[in-house]
From Swiss-Prot:
PROSITE patterns: HISOL_DEHYDROGENASE. Belongs to the histidinol dehydrogenase family. This is Histidinol dehydrogenase. Its EC number is 1.1.1.23. Catalyzes the sequential NAD-dependent oxidations of L-histidinol to L-histidinaldehyde and then to L-histidine. It catalyses: L-histidinol + 2 NAD(+) + H2O = L-histidine + 2 NADH + 3 H(+). The active site is at E321, H322. Zn(2+) binds at Q252, H255, D355, H414. It comes from Halobacterium salinarum (strain ATCC 700922 / JCM 11081 / NRC-1) (Halobacterium halobium). Its cofactor is Zn(2+). The keyword Acyltransferase does not apply.
Length: 425
């Protein structure tokens, strides 16, 4: 891994860095077929697809009853860690809850907003034999905090669903758990089957099949966003500890061979030290092949900027899922960067802390969509409704404005609906 100069980036290199996509086009037609099967065949399709894709003959699709047993079965230290993480995530998301409000804006005119949760949510949690309890916690807890009536989890089927995943669903407060994976899980949530209830909102990370399915069903249900492989961008200055930066890059790279990991600094010696630290630690990692592939990704690299202003511009254009700022003036730099899914300030805020237990959510926008949206939060599950109360005095004050604008738009009935309330004058 060699460092590069930002100023020398060729146009095609810039495209690879700044115009990333989720890579779903290649599977769209296959995903559409899967969704059609789920919509038309229901549980029959879910069982057939489990056999086809997961090599599992599924009996009960609903494994809700296994949650409590799993919580008792996992090692105490694991369940304690799940509960500790859940408590932190819950506290942070409870702090996000908005209050209903109503205020007087003029005599006789009150305006306000109220917030109500959607009723049913589906959370996709990757992994069948593998365990991703953190994804369960991150998806379920904000929905529960928002007041959603029914929160269901779907996770890929296995001969035995990993008890850690089920234990996390129990700790998070999930109401249902289904052993359904991939695009078919998204279809089941969107269209319903004999076993799986339809939901109003589908959230959670997944592979390109899951992402393509979410794109297809958007409109039938609400979704969080279309997420791609994991991303990290580190902004570092000469005070950054290269070993810390390298450790963070390697940690994110182990997610996926398509993950994108980037460091940008205004100090060439720091860039060289980071690349050396990455190389020194790479071969010792259990997932070295995956990490190596991610480091070779066209959207990955270590870059030297001519100034910290250029580094900031690079970070803003990249709009990373995870942004780490390891620099002496990290708060000042943060004020200059608007586009990032989640920000980690200082050398002792590794992304792994946010991934698991700091309390913030790790379901975040990727592929530059942090320019236009934020990560999963309580707001994802809330609907806001505006409220207005006018008395006669309040409407009288607005009467001329409303009727004039209604007449200008040729909507005579709108004007008449106001005038009708003053016919006794």
């Amino acid at each position: 891994m060699e460092y590069e100069a930002v100023a020398d980036l060729a146009p095609d290199r810039r495209v690879a860095l700044f115009e990333r996509d989720a890579g779903v086009d290649a599977v769209r037609s296959d995903v559409a077929e899967i969704l059609d099967r789920v919509e038309s065949e229901g549980d029959v399709a879910l069982r057939a697809l489990a056999s086809e894709f997961d090599d599992v003959e599924v009996g009960n699709l609903d494994v809700t009853d296994e949650m409590e047993r799993a919580a008792d079965a996992v090692p105490d230290d694991v369940y304690d860690a799940i509960e500790d993480a859940a408590a932190n995530i819950r506290a942070f998301h409870e702090a996000q809850l908005p209050d209903d409000w109503r205020e007087s804006f003029a005599a006789g005119r009150e305006l306000g907003r109220r917030f109500r949760p959607v009723r049913r949510v589906g959370v996709y949690a990757p992994g069948g034999t593998a365990a991703y309890p953190s994804s369960v916690l991150m998806g379920v807890i904000p929905a529960v905090v928002a007041g959603v009536e029914q929160v269901a989890v779907a996770t890929p089927p296995a001969e035995t669903i990993n008890p850690v995943t089920l234990a996390a669903a129990h700790a998070a407060g999930a109401d249902r758990v289904y052993q359904v994976g991939g695009a078919q899980a998204i279809g089941a949530f969107a269209y319903g089957t004999e076993t799986v209830d339809t939901v109003q909102t589908v959230v959670g990370p997944g592979n390109k099949w899951v992402t393509a399915a979410k794109a297809e069903v958007r409109g039938d249900v609400e979704i969080d966003f279309l997420a791609g492989p994991s991303e990290l961008l580190v902004v570092a200055d000469e005070t950054a500890e290269p070993a810390f930066v390298a450790a963070d890059l390697l940690a994110q790279a182990e997610h996926d061979p398509n993950a994108s990991v980037v460091a940008v600094t205004d100090d060439e010696a720091t860039a060289a030290a980071i690349t050396d630290a990455v190389a020194a630690r790479l071969d010792d990692r259990e997932r070295a092949d995956t990490i190596r592939a991610a480091l070779d990704n066209e959207a990955s690299g270590v870059f030297v900027a001519r100034s910290m202003s250029e580094a900031v511009m690079f970070a803003e254009e990249y709009a990373a899922e995870h942004l780490s700022i390891q620099a002496s003036d990290d708060e000042a730099l943060l004020d200059r960067i608007d586009s990032a899914g989640s920000v980690f300030l200082g050398g002792y805020a590794p992304v792994a802390a946010g991934d698991y237990a700091a309390g913030t959510n790790h379901v975040l926008p990727t592929n530059g969509t942090a320019r236009v949206t934020g990560g999963l939060s309580v707001d994802t599950f809330l609907r806001s409704t505006t409220v207005q109360r006018l008395d006669r005095e309040g409407l009288a004050a607005l009467r001329e404005t409303v009727t004039t604008l209604a007449d200008a738009e040729g909507l005579e009935g709108h004007a008449a609906s106001v005038d009708a309330r003053f016919e006794d004058e």
